Design a protein with these regions (language model features):
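N-terminal leader/targeting and accessory segments in enzymes
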Residues: 3-112, 116, 291, 301, ...
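Phosphate-binding loop of NTP-binding sites
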Residues: 10, 37-40, 78-82, 91-235, ...
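Adenine nucleotide phosphate-binding catalytic loops in nucleotide-utilizing enzymes
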Residues: 20, 25-27, 209-212, 249-329
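Residues in the short beta-alpha loop(s) of Rossmann-like NAD(P)-binding domains
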Residues: 28, 51, 158, 236-237, ...
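Short linear Ser/Thr-Pro motifs
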Residues: 30, 90, 180-181, 255
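Short, glycine- and charge-enriched coil/turn segments that flank and shape catalytic ligand pockets
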Residues: 51-70, 105-107, 148-151, 168-173, ...
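Residues at the C-termini of beta-strands that transition into short coil/loop
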Residues: 75, 114, 156, 254-257, ...
């Protein structure tokens, strides 16, 4: 089976959206944030929602950004498709719907809200994906960054759309993004400086159809990284261990089961960082407020990302000692 992402083969990092007509698919939180960003940038958008019985008045009351916009419900007619230059797809909309396939066949570029935000955002980016542990790790990395940098934004699948903050970023902004497999399906140029894939276990196969496609989607978070960028991977995940050997980026592994010559590892109750020459103790797990092997793995991933991003170890440890568990969503 051929895995299909949402964006097809279309690629143009310098696309000028001025004068373009953008179709926003989905009227929920993600769609509203995308529409708000487009409106801020003076770009015309059309809203589409597959619910033909959607209460438009209630929708506009909840999301005034849709007031005055053209709103299409139920089905998208061919004449409507002909007027569209770009599609922004909400993460909850499957990329293999007949309508999406038809838009793709018409060579209309299809982005997700992450890609749209990246098009306008400035600054440096850290992105985190994985089947489990994303929210805890993203929150921890966000707090570490805020302990060292002045302008930090934590966005993505954690609950804050990237599009809602993209217009407020500067070259000094550090953005920490939790990225789901659904969001990765519709990224094309998104290029984080540091990425992490925490683990990969069977999930969302009703959407991705096969484990191979799910893995491919998760691994695509690295596709635009360069040799100077870094990917942090779980050494104890066999898929990710093999994947690390194929990357042209810097790779930092972490392990909860064995000592690593380079990377982060758990030895008894101590977490160490090994640079190939020296093994440095980072913290004893009893000094943490989050317990369990899965959380120690999240901590090691966060430390690996933060060190790769240039944060001093002492600034990292300060946050590790005070970080509290994230409320389960």
């Amino acid at each position: 089976m051929t895995c299909r992402n949402g964006a097809g083969d279309w690629k143009d990092k310098t696309m000028n959206l001025e004068g373009k007509r953008v179709l926003v698919v989905g009227s929920g939180k993600s769609g509203a944030a995308a529409a708000e960003l487009l409106r801020k940038k003076g770009i015309t958008f059309v809203l589409f929602d597959g619910n033909k019985d959607l209460d438009v008045a209630a929708l506009i009351g909840k999301n005034p950004v849709f007031a005055g916009a053209e709103i299409l419900l139920g089905e998208l007619a061919p004449e409507d498709m002909a007027r569209i230059d770009l599609v922004v797809l909400s993460p909850g909309v499957p990329t293999d719907l007949p309508m999406v396939n038809e838009l793709r066949n018409r060579q209309i570029p299809i982005w997700g809200e992450i890609e749209l935000a990246y098009h306008f955002a400035k600054g440096r980016i850290i992105a985190i994906t994985g089947t489990n542990g994303k929210t805890t790790t993203t929150s921890l990395v966000g707090e570490i960054m805020a302990n060292y940098f002045d302008d930090v934004k934590v966005v993505g699948n954690i609950g804050i759309p990237y599009t809602s903050v993209a217009a407020d970023t500067t070259e000094d902004t550090v953005t920490v993004a939790e990225i789901s497999s659904f969001q990765l399906e519709t990224t094309r140029e998104f290029a984080p400086e540091v990425t992490a894939i925490l683990n990969i276990t069977p999930d969302h196969l009703n959407r991705h159809h096969t484990m191979e496609c799910y893995i491919e989607t998760k691994e695509s978070i690295t596709k635009n990284q360069t040799a100077g960028d870094t990917c942090v991977l779980n050494y104890e995940d066999e898929v990710l261990r093999r994947f690390g050997g194929t990357l042209h980026t810097k790779v930092v592994f972490f392990s909860s089961r064995r000592r690593l010559e380079k990377g982060l590892y758990l030895d008894g109750e101590d977490i160490f960082y090994a640079d190939g020459t020296t093994d440095t103790k980072v913290i004893n797990v009893n000094e943490l407020n989050i317990l369990g092997k899965h959380n120690y793995e999240n901590v090691m991933a966060a430390v690996g990302m933060s060190l790769s991003f240039g944060v001093p170890m002492d600034k990292i440890v300060e946050v590790l000692k005070r970080f509290q568990a994230v409320e389960h969503r």
